[in-house]
A protein has these predicted regions:
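ATP-dependent carboxylate-amine ligase catalytic core
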Residues: 2-19, 25-113, 121-148, 156-160
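Beta-strand->loop->alpha-helix junctions that form or flank phosphate-binding loops
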Residues: 39, 174-182, 293-301
Length: 475
């Protein structure tokens, strides 16, 4: 069977994509189908839901972060181990950079990977208007990628009423509906959805949703459409088999760089708990590809960093929700501060950057002492401070080898000491600001970097960890 993929997209955010994606993944898993998941765009939280449902990593695919060749490489990685790929879109189907560009949109990703699109339409409070709405969306679909629609938040009876109208007037298959499920509600907070570990009984809720989707949607028809697309496009290209995008052992791709056997594999201690949990899977894989050995630790629960650590990676998350616990873990704060002051290389992004400050206010406005590496404090501004994609360049070259790295920001907190080592520039409007504290061994700031957009960042960080390892062993 040919590998089949799809992009599950919607006209706008809040249409129920994540709920239906999770229900679909669970239903496919219940059918014993080998399925994997991706998220279009830079979001961290949706892939966490995918992982909870299917038990394998879900990765981001983003046409701003990566060029077409790299996108195909990332999608091709491990593809032969799975029969299906489900990519959850971001925002509206055609919404890219700045809301006005194609680049970065779910549709652009579908074009890049030559995949079909299944729409999720929030049909609440609509009748024939949904035909007009779908007609407009189809008019923009010049590649004819949209192969079907699922009517969300509507009854089975009304779906049966509207199906012949939509199919006869638009020629668009209606793949069923998904009625409102009071038992399944993915709650949100200021950074988006609440994290899956915060939701009691998530697996049971998603399995119930999967059972309902099997009842109210025609998944057999959807899978047949995906297989037909894969066959048609394989034969169109003169092939009866999808091409291998990577040759094992010969690959020069960004995630498959061979480790130099003669060099040490430095240990990179990665913060991972309720406070620090935002990591791009491909960032972690690239650190390993360049020779780093990743070990996990919890700034919330453990007393100190791992003894074998040669470098620290403090990712994003929700440290403001755990400010008291982080502050009261004095031994960990001291351990991190002493390690960095003694020369251990470190990267801290967004939430990790906040943790390195002298203090941080929690959501109630109470101020808590933090690690004390960066002079200043972080406070909730009550509104989005910076949001969207940026290109980050250094004022003086340390980590980036003279090239930009692509990144994303989304935060309501701000620092009174954001740093001035780099300049961040928004790709459409050209708005810019200074950011980042860095030297040859440390990089601290709000932007969430996508490392494969500039692998020199990882190469420099791992080499700094390797140098620290040698220095420590020489003492």
């Amino acid at each position: 069977m040919l590998h089949s993929g799809m992009v599950l997209a919607a006209p706008q955010s809040g249409s129920g994509k994540t709920t239906i994606t999770c229900a679909l993944l669970a239903a496919m898993k219940n059918r014993k189908l080998a399925v994997r998941a991706f998220k279009s765009g830079p979001d961290y939280i949706d892939p966490m839901f995918h992982r909870q449902v299917i038990g394998v990593p879900s990765r981001n695919l983003d046409t701003f972060f990566s060029g077409a060749d790299q996108i195909r490489e990332l999608y091709g990685y491990d593809r032969e181990s799975f029969s299906y790929s489900v990519i959850e879109g971001a925002m509206g189907l055609y919404d890219g950079l700045g809301g006005t560009q194609k680049e970065g949109s779910a549709y652009h990703l579908a074009q890049t990977l030559d995949l079909p699109v299944v729409l999720v339409l929030d049909a609440r409070g609509m009748g024939r208007t949904m035909v007009a709405l779908l007609a407009g969306i189809l008019q923009y679909d010049r590649d004819h990628r949209i192969i079907g629609v699922i009517l969300n938040r509507t009854s089975e009876g009304f779906c049966r009423t509207m199906t012949p109208v939509i199919e006869e007037e638009l020629g668009l298959p209606v793949l069923g509906c998904f009625p409102v499920q009071k038992s399944l509600h993915l709650e949100s907070r200021h950074l988006g959805l609440k994290m899956p570990q915060e939701m009691e009984g998530l697996r049971q809720q998603v399995n119930q949703a999967a059972e309902k989707l099997e009842e109210t949607a025609d998944l057999d028809r959807m899978l047949q459409l995906l297989q037909s697309w894969a066959l048609l496009h394989a034969f169109r290209d003169g092939k009866t088999k999808l091409p291998k995008l990577q040759e094992p052992g010969k690959d020069k791709g960004v995630l498959q760089k061979k480790k130099k056997q003669q060099e040490e594999c430095p240990v990179i201690a990665v913060a991972k708990d309720e406070a620090f949990c935002f990591y791009y899977e491909d960032n972690l894989r690239l650190l390993e590809a360049y020779g780093g050995k990743l070990v996990w630790f919890s700034p919330l629960a453990q007393e100190k960093i791992p003894e074998e650590a040669d470098a620290l990676l403090l990712g994003g998350g929700y440290p403001e929700l755990c400010a008291r616990q982080l502050s009261e873990n004095v031994s960990m704060r001291n351990s991190i501060r002493e390690a960095i002051e003694n020369g251990m290389p470190s990267v801290a992004e967004c939430g990790g950057f906040m943790y390195l400050h002298e203090s941080m206010t929690d959501e109630e406005g109470e101020n808590w002492p933090m690690a004390g590496i960066i002079t200043g404090s972080c406070h909730n501004r009550g509104k989005l401070v910076r949001f969207g994609y940026v290109n980050v360049t250094e004022q003086t070259s340390h980590f980036l080898a003279g090239k930009p790295v692509r990144a994303h920001e989304f935060h309501y907190y701000d620092s009174d000491n954001n740093g001035e080592s780099c300049v961040a520039v928004k790709p459409v409007r050209g708005t810019s600001w200074t950011c980042i504290h860095e030297d040859d061994r440390n990089w601290w700031g709000y932007p969430h970097l996508y490392y494969p957009s500039n692998p020199a960042f990882v190469e420099h960080f791992v080499q700094a960890a390797r140098l620290y390892h040698r220095e420590r062993n020489a003492k």
